[in-house]
Amino acid sequence: MVSVEFLQELPKCEHHLHLEGTLEPDLLFPLAKRNDIILPEGFPKSVEELNEKYKKFRDLQDFLDYYYIGTNVLISEQDFFDLAWAYFKKVHKQGLVHAEVFYDPQSHTSRGISIETVTKGFQRACDKAFSEFGITSKLIMCLLRHIEPEECLKTIEEATPFIKDGTISALGLDSAEKPFPPHLFVECYGKAASLNKDLKLTAHAGEEGPAQFVSDALDLLQVTRIDHGINSQYDEELLDRLSRDQTMLTICPLSNVKLQVVQSVSELPLQKFLDRDVPFSLNSDDPAYFGGYILDVYTQVSKDFPHWDHETWGRIAKNAIKGSWCDDKRKNGLLSRVDEVVTKYSH
């Protein structure tokens, strides 16, 4: 098994991180107080109680119920900045070099908070992460799939200035997967893509939904990346396609265990994806709720796949860099750093 020191030093990219999912209990309660938010009856009353609840979710919906309550404490641009900045401070110490992060404006606009407030707060934190830590980042605006597509089209309208000027680098699709297949959002994706030819497209698919949802996201939504995608393992033709096109899956091992998608990280088809040359990155998803940030994810995977050597981990890190949406100069610099770290620890 490789050392934690090696995993920490390995340059890491994160592509599946919900900023609202980094809301730790020790920030949630102070923000509730700052903004005079009364948490619902029956909600845990202390950091300790809430941490206990986060240790055991029944399924995706049980988690989402808590997740959406948590978002209610975020009101001002400063709140959104504080949230994202807390994330960047943590992951900087863990060897993160590039982050492409999700946010859910509809969780906030539905409460009367403007998309400008949310986006500007998060973007300020991204700017500071670059100036202070050298971390490059991109914002991915997600549509909530449990919201009517007509409402999602309105969200895209509201976000138009940020899509056109590149503040929003990509469009994503999240929330409860099974009842809301990709075909419902064809018009939304087409509309967003028409606003900026450089807008990247991704979608959550194949987590609780079938492999067919992955194929549909590729065919109908024209995405070039799949978030989760682990159920692709059951479709041999799809695996061939993902390998041929080098379509990256953004896999979230701790999340998959916490939400009972699998019982342990060792059950994930990571070795199969490596063997089939299907590129993937390892990510923390909603780390405040799922018990670990990026280095915790890498460390747990290394325990469950102890036969992976330095070269294998170097390959995983390189696939994450190659699948990122940063420019070639940045990619080449990071790829060289991976080689340096692998060489350092292999001798």
From Swiss-Prot:
- InterPro entries assigned: A/AMP_deam_AS, A_deaminase_dom, ADE, Ado/ade_deaminase, Metal_Hydrolase
Q: Which domain of life is it from?
A: Eukaryota
Write down the species. Saccharomyces cerevisiae (strain ATCC 204508 / S288c) (Baker's yeast)
Provide the E.C. number(s) assigned to this enzyme. 3.5.4.2
Q: What is this protein called?
A: Adenine deaminase
Principal place where this protein is found?
cytoplasm
- Please verify whether the record's keywords include Lipid biosynthesis: no
In terms of NCBIfam families, this protein maps to: aden_deam (TIGR01430)
Q: Which reaction does it catalyse?
A: adenine + H2O + H(+) = hypoxanthine + NH4(+)
Q: What gene name does this entry carry?
A: AAH1
Stimuli inducing this protein? Reduced when grown in a poor nitrogen source medium and strongly down-regulated when cells enter quiescence under nutrient-limiting conditions.
What the entry lists under HAMAP family is as follows: Adenine_deaminase (MF_01962)
